[in-house]
Amino acid sequence: MTFAVKFWGIRGSIACPSPEYIKYGGNTSCLEVIADDRHIVLDAGTGIRGLGKKFLAHDIREAHLLLTHTHWDHINGFPFFVPAYDPNRSIHIMAGHLNAEQGGIRYALSQQMDSPMFPVPLEAMRANLRFEDFEAGDEFNIAGVRVRTVPLNHPNGATGYRLEYNGK
C-alpha cells in the first residue's frame, strides 16, 4: 500500500526561481498525493508544471485536482499543465470556496485563461476535464480516499483538505 505526499511547490505569492531559494524550491503551491494508483493534486501553482512532466513520463492518465482557493499563486501553473491538453487524459477539478455569484471553478479558471490575460483559452485543453464545486465542510470519497474539507479564514475564502487512506 502506497500513501505518499510530494511537494512540487511551497512558495506563496510569487515563484522564486533563483539559487538562494533552491533548498526548498521556488515554485508556488502544488502537492501530489499518491494513494496506490490514485493521484490527487492539491493546488495548481507553478509546481504543477513539473508534476505534468512526471504524469507524461509515467503515463498517468487520471487525476483529481483539489483547489484550496483561486488566488494567482494557487492556479497560475494550471495553463502550463500539459496533461490537460491531451485528449487521452482525465482530470476532475474541484473547489469548495466559490459561491454561485462567483460562477464556480470552471468560470474562475476560464477567466484566468481568457484574452487578454492568456493567449490560449480553457477550451484548448482537450483532456476530459470535469469541474465540480462543493461547499467547504463537505466530505467525499475519491476512489477509496476519504476527503474531509473545512472552510478556512482567508481573503476571498479558501478550503482546507484532510485526506485519509487505509487508516492513514
Question: Each predicted region: which residue ranges?
Answer:
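Binuclear metal-dependent hydrolase catalytic cores
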Residues: M1-K168
